[in-house]
């Protein structure tokens, strides 16, 4: 196992890089597909997993997120959506979330836990005349609560600008992962350029 920078240069301990592996249990190539093989293997035969991580002084590997999901901030900071989503999902009223970028701002798409919401705002169940307006007011309050909750726990360049409610459950892949590309496209995230999808020289925090 080793951590890479720019595809093939090993990272020093403590710095974030792409995880590469090699061994008996790792595939050697894509069958009869040299082009795809070249994309995921280094010239000396290490398989690039697409995961970003760093090694602690005592040898523990910590995963930051996926290389293809990384967002480069306005001043070149590496922002890992999965780390922000972990904080979002720890909020009692958040069922699931996705962090994306829009016009240089970080946006959290959040699907709220309806059972928890109705337990908090139980009175809304019984007054159908006022329910819609009152519910929207409560949701606005909750979005502000979640925004403050997350921004108090992440570094300054990972702070959210806005929380947007996703009323329907997120569309998932067969492996139960959110189809990020659908929501990135829907909410205006700029396409990731090849040169921007590489970790900058950032110390692990």
What spans do the regions from the language model cover?
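C-terminal boundary motif of the adenylate-forming
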Residues: 52, 57, 90-115
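Conserved ATP-binding/catalytic segment of the ANL
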Residues: 9-14, 18-73, 90
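Conserved C-terminal "lid"/linker of ANL adenylate-forming enzymes
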Residues: 96, 104, 145-204
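Adenylate-forming
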Residues: 26, 60-89, 116-137, 156-161
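Structured core elements
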Residues: 2-3, 18-20, 48, 54, ...
């Amino acid at each position: 196992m080793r951590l890479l920078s720019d595809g093939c240069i090993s990272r020093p301990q403590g710095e974030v890089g792409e995880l590469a592996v090699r061994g008996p249990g790792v595939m050697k190539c894509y069958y009869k597909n040299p082009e795809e093989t070249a994309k995921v293997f280094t010239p000396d035969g290490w398989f690039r997993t697409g995961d970003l991580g760093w090694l602690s002084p005592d040898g523990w590997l910590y995963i930051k997120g996926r290389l293809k999901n990384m967002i480069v901030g306005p001043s070149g900071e590496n922002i890992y959506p999965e780390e922000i989503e972990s904080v979002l999902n720890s909020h009692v009223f958040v069922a699931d979330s996705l962090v994306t970028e829009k016009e240089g701002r970080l946006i959290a798409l959040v699907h709220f836990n309806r059972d928890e919401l109705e337990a908090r705002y139980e009175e809304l169940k019984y007054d159908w005349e006022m329910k819609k307006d009152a519910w929207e007011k409560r949701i606005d309050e909750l979005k502000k609560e979640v925004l403050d909750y997350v921004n108090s726990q992440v570094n300054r360049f990972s702070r959210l600008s806005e929380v947007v409610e996703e009323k329907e459950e997120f569309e998932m892949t067969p492996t139960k992962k959110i189809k990020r590309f659908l929501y990135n496209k829907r909410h205006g995230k700029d396409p990731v350029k090849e040169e921007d999808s590489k970790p900058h020289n950032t110390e692990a925090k």
